[in-house]
């Protein structure tokens, strides 16, 4: 799950914060800031991008609602992630959230027993509390779901597998390019990042190219892939993923 920074409330030509009367009116602004991806599963979407309230506007009785129209409470989601999340009360102490944590760190994408599908699991090496939080986030968004119904709706696991194949292909192209006497490092790294922009599922790309600093620089370049939280990657150390909340001793992720 890609860590995000969508920035402050957009402004109009006069520099005034934009105010909307319907939350869906944030859609184009969100696309301009973070791209056309579901913020949770990271699949790219050509249509049906849903504007989703991070903190539900209609939570269960007794739970404070999230702001119905505020920019700070808006993100983009696919139907399966948004429907799974529903009106569940949300806070950053219970779940890993892309604007609050380095959400690349607590999850891994792996093949299911059925190799046509890839699912999200808790990353190896988490402590007990982090593992539970990662598990709860996966459960909240059904990121380990495989839709086996004849009238399949949720194809996230199929798209993850397709992204895995894209990453493998990109790695082969990269290795051949590096071996070429005409190798241009900047051109090749930029090409890899543009492939990632088309593919989505960014954690797969970070994992594959983690030891290629120039590729990591391009993968986290907001001019190529909008909205990545650059403070979650260390430019002094080859753009390695780092904790977003280092002051939180219990869980710096």
Residue ranges and their predicted role:
Residues 19-20, 40-76, 85-107:
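Histidine-centered nuclease catalytic patch
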Residues 134-253:
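C-terminal, charged low-complexity interaction regions
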Residues 1-37, 60-72, 190:
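Short, charged surface segments at domain edges that flank catalytic/cofactor-binding sites
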Residues 95-129:
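Internal, well-ordered alpha/beta segment that forms a basic, Gly-enriched binding/recognition surface
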Residues 68, 72-75, 101, 128-134, ...:
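Alpha-helix initiation and capping sites
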Residues 2-16, 120-123, 140-154, 173-175:
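Charged, low-complexity surface segments at secondary-structure and domain boundaries
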């Amino acid at each position: 799950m890609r860590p995000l920074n969508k920035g402050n409330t957009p402004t109009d030509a006069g520099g005034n914060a934009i105010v909307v009367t319907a939350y869906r009116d944030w859609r184009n602004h969100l696309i301009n800031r973070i791209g056309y991806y579901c913020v949770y599963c990271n699949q790219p979407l050509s249509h049906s991008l849903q504007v989703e309230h991070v903190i539900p506007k209609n939570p269960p009785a007794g739970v404070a609602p999230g702001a119905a129209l505020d920019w700070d409470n808006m993100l983009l989601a696919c139907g399966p992630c948004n429907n799974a999340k529903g009106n569940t009360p949300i806070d950053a102490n219970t779940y890993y959230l892309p604007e609050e944590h380095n959400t690349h760190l607590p999850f891994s994408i792996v093949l299911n027993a059925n190799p046509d599908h890839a699912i999200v699991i808790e990353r190896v090496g988490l402590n007990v509390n982090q593992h539970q939080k990662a598990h709860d986030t996966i459960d909240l968004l059904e990121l380990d779901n495989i839709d086996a119904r004849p009238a399949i709706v949720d194809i996230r696991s199929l798209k993850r597998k397709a992204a895995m194949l894209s990453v493998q292909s990109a790695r082969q192209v990269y290795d051949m390019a590096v071996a070429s006497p005409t190798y241009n490092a900047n051109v090749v790294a930029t090409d890899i990042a543009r492939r990632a922009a088309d593919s989505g599922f960014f954690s797969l790309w970070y994992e594959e190219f983690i030891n290629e600093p120039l590729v990591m620089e391009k993968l986290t370049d907001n001019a190529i892939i909008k909205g990545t939280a650059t403070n979650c990657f260390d430019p002094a150390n080859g753009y390695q993923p780092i904790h977003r909340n280092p002051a939180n001793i219990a869980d710096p992720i």
